[in-house]
Amino acid sequence: MGQDVRSPRGPRCIALVGPFQSGKTTLLEAILARTGAIPRAGSVDDGTSVGDATPEARHHKMTVGLTAATTSFMGDSYTFLDCPGSVEFAHDMRAALPAVDAAIVVCEADEKKLPQLQIILRELEELKIPRFLFLNKIDRANKRIRETLAMLQPASRVPLVLRQIPIWKGELIEGFVDLALERAFIYREHKASEVVALDGGNLDREKEARFSMLEKLADHDDALMEQLLEDIQPPRDAVFDDLARELREGLICPVLLGAASRENGVLRLMKALRHEAPGIAETAKRLGAPSAKDALGFVFKTLHSQHGGKLSLTRLLAGHLDDGATLQSASGGTSRISGILAVNGAYDTKRATADAGDTVALAKLDPIKTGDTVSSGKTAPAALAAAEPTPPVLAISVAATDRKDDVKLGQALMRLHEEDPSLVVVQNAQTHDTVLWGQGEMHLRVASERLRDRFGVKITSHPPAIGYQETIRKPIVQRGRHKKQSGGHGQFGDVVLDIQPLPRGEGFRFAEKVVGGAVPRNYIGAVEEGVVDGLARGPLGFPVTDVQVTLTDGSYHSVDSSDLAFRTAARIGLNEGLPQCQSVLLEPIHVVEIVCPTDATAKINAILSARRGQILGFDTRDGWSGWDCVRAMMPEAEIGELIVELRSATAGAGSFTRQFDHMAEVTGRAADQIIAAHQHAA
């Protein structure tokens, strides 16, 4: 059965993860209250919780960003990371997971949330993070525990091992039996559970359930298997050792019961963490951190406060760190620490030092960003694995309500991206708009609120412009002539342009076939610049593409000709020639790949068809039981709000990626409406 793995492992860091509204923040409050970190548990609904302390979280009554809080239990220090359950804010969870020793997956007996649970468990499995499953809201249970476990098991690749069974009183659960301890407890609201005699029907149920637990442990322990075959009861300490080892190695996912709102099951959960969760040495090994005397840390979250400046939430993987130390980053930055702060939800308590295992906030590490590996050594450390931001799926164009705030807006957007890399800011080269990309409606709404409340920038927003273009069907030869006489040197340029359509996707080509020096070679570049100017806005009001323009002839004046004159002449030639070329509107088409639970595939197909999507096919999602992957061609104009419908149809579990494929013609009434709307907006 191996050696005892339950020795103290230093300060530990535990992630609280789970589907949206499963009770993670309520569990954090219960943990902090039961361990004495706060006098009593706060409430999400009342806006008094430690976890949802930001104005945005309290306004929306949901976790919209990671919160870290530290407590102590039986002499050990624990930092809990309350991670958002909404898929729109999931990057905070992904960025933090490499730093944790273990995760508590908070869930409930709700089949609708099973796909969300599967996504979270898969993330933990791939990162090899030990995990407990806390079956919350057990006071509202309307299913027997075996039925619930059978429902949840498909979400996990490894066995869900029941550590406790409920004690029923009629149709209500009044306590539980700990299968490893072989003790029975009756819940007491907001108090420690009361130990009661294990007898009668509960004893029979305990023996059956305990044997089932031991059988699952024995799948990875030959000595235990032999004992079970010989009808020998294994020592209790040996069972705990097996639970700890198999948890650490990712062979099982223990399941514990409770009701966070009543603080039921919290102390047993803490004891399971204390006995079984790995410590910082195992976590550093899992991450591939090198052995060194220097301090080594992983930055998993960046925060900007109105008055406190930049804070980098950091897990110290090894070594000792003093305030004022200089840190080297794997990304190349160097910075001196301007303060070490304890993480207690508010980040306002100073510390002089930090040691391996501690989770702290480091002040004003300006070049250092989320996902960086930092070291107090003289050379930059090797980078440890960091989460890549999820590609954004929804965008808005933003502008400062007061133009005097334009620079301030740019700085604030940069800080928002630093805090949350899944928010992406781009400049539209065609419209020069600032476009803010995010993970959904709520994600963008909260970003707008933070711009206003934290950075003092009010914004206006609207849907971003679609990348429409236009092309031509008919060739033409057009002269462009610019002549201006205003005393002294005049302006003269004369060009003949052959304008030809190109196959779709060829873009723009320029050529010259001038003979006899009709247009001197030093003016050819100016002619091309004028052509580009003329193609920037065609007769329909959009950039022109898939066109070749050839300079074939022209004339010049030895005194009055100049680069400006020939550039102007070429632009005039385009502006006069293009309206005669039978312009046609083009819209961008993307390949969209959607992943969704199989039972939602029919709904997804209907949504795609209603949005002018051309379904290319679908297949089962590789390695994901009960999931499909649907591929389709879709106009960019129809993708804008796709994520809203997709999440509505999949209980928040569906997602998609997109890739530009080609430009396609738009004709008839649809084209007329697009052109009219564009001209009205201009």
Predicted features, each with a name:
Residues 1-682:
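Structural and coupling elements of P-loop NTPases
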